[in-house]
Amino acid sequence: MPPDDRLLMLPTSKTDNRPTTITKLTPFTKQLYTLNKPAKCLPTLSSLALFVGAMLTPLCAQAALPEAIQTALTHAHLSTADISIVITPVGDKDASRLPAPIQVIDSTKPANQPETLTTDDGTAGPSSIQKQALKNNNAKEVSVHQSPLMTIEKQTIKQHARQLHAYTDDPYTYQSIESIPSLLPENALVSAKNHNSSIKDSAKDNESSKNNNDKSTAHSPVIKISFSPLLSHQANIARTPASTMKLVPSFIALDTLGADFVWHTRVYHTGIIIGDKLYGDLIIQGSGDPKMTHERLQQLLYKVQSAGIRHINGDIIVDSAVFKNVTKDPAAFDNSPLRPYNASPDGFLVNFSSIGIQSYPLDNTRAQLTYTPQLANYQLPSMINIRSAACGQARYSIAPQWQPTQLTLNTNLPNSCGEHAFYVAYPDAKDFAARVIASKWQTLGNTLSGKVISQETPYSANNTSDKQTKLPRGLAAIAMSPLPIVSYPSLNLTQQIYDINHFSNNVMTEQVALSIGAYNSTNNPINKAGSNKINTDKASTNKESVNNKSSDTNKVINNQATSLYQFGQPKATDYPQALQTINQWWQTKLTTPPPHLSNGSGLCRDCSISAANLSELLTYAYEQPSFDAYVSSLGIAGVSGTISAHSERLPKSQAIGRAWIKTGTLNNVTSMAGYVKGLSGQDYVVVGIINTDQALNAYNARTVLDTMLDWTAQH
């Protein structure tokens, strides 16, 4: 981030953030300043008073960083000015809301060693953990809290990571698209849920008992414990957060839409169905579903087929009007338009607008290529030559380039790739969706006489279509208003934000952020007949994948109060509206000013948030009903998600299996934020953000924040 950009960042606190001691000393020092005028010796006294006041400032306000963190900063060639940290205790240590810790064991150790938490001595029991905490903290004795532990083999984690990186150049996109099961054993997930459920049930029982006893009396206010930060360093400086910004829309969505919220993609038809043939158009009304993978799209089309339609004498219209004007230049951010993380959101996003290219070597000179999903009326090369080279990202290994009617590969496949999956983003979400739909419809054995038309405007119920002339005699008089045939629910929000925070899925985050604006009940109540009609923006685009030369115009609707097609639909939204809804939520629920956002995923250099802001959000989330879904979406330090390499960078960290973290990385940004369960049983909110004016060494910078997690876990 350029140096001058920091001066443009929004303020991050409404209140005077001067240390309390300094504030209280201000009147006294002013009096000293007045007294120093007649006597030359008094300026020294005034300076001394200010110095004493500064020395009395609380540790959390002007803290020297812990030695371990300072050492890591020095090793990374970073200064204390480059980092903001806030670490705050949260909740009651006897009623933790965090999942049970994960015990990472190493069976390669001698069999006579106990399989307990990893420490500097390899493995050790509670007493040695306590000694290690004392050694590292140089502090008073820590009472080690015994939490129920789930176990997983260290070698299992390593093997899983090796297999992923050997198989694909983009393991996070692969895991999102293919819905790869969690590495953790199922009983670990169930235990964590039961652990938190028992706490919530106990709280409900207590609340119910209280209500029964106090029905005749006024309800007394709930007293919440407020902790001072364990460590606060440059907490109020606005910084670029990178992907830790995903924590903002993902929680606000949970809080406003609910953990069980689902998107409903609805299918309508015009005309009439005779036998298994539709004389009219099939309309797919996009809902903004973040995870309409190619397999789920095929299930949607299969439901249409099961409803009795196999042949369409008309067009398939894709209505993506729920989001408007959200398409971006995929090369604008970092000149990497082929990377799936740069894909644009869309009202009907299919497979993250990305295609999987699988290589299968036939011999030492050639390899066969397959594609998932297939694209209708688009040429995809089936063979590629092999060269001697190391396997890397798609842009280096196969150098793909999207042409109007074909994909070209501008280099030969490295021989070290073997059977490998590359993920490449298509440049146009609407054209991609249209081509995949056409291909899937045909794969199911169905036919389509017209085209697949993807547009950012609703279908026209009263459009004068030339297909009316194709109807059998006498059917032209039948009303053409769209009629519902299929409603296909998405995965619920809890499942969606798992991908967002565990695999740092950018385009899914954008879909969720936009959905906050579209589905928020406060700003967009369920549509009633004749109200909140979908805006038909004149700038909306029209994509026709099957025949790009077609002169057909958009089939735009004049909203009618009696149309089932518009009933119950959310109001169309765009980024300004969605981000305003996020700001309104923040101003209502929290005390600090909202972050500065230009999108939801953190893939931006003009976005900013302070460590104090993010810490307040995480602290608020900890107390909310949707917290289980939120914390379960985060990666586990040294175990899973984008923080799984924590144990490789810091093998003896006490945070392994005890920290639930979202990470963020840009070329000059490294960040981590989430929750840590201390050895004492106390839960902590942790936020660390590193910004520099030039590109930084990401590995070394991450180690600084790894050390922050380790230091916190020792408490």
What are the functions of these language-model segments?
Residues H233-R239, Y423, S601-C604:
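A short glycine/serine-rich beta->alpha loop
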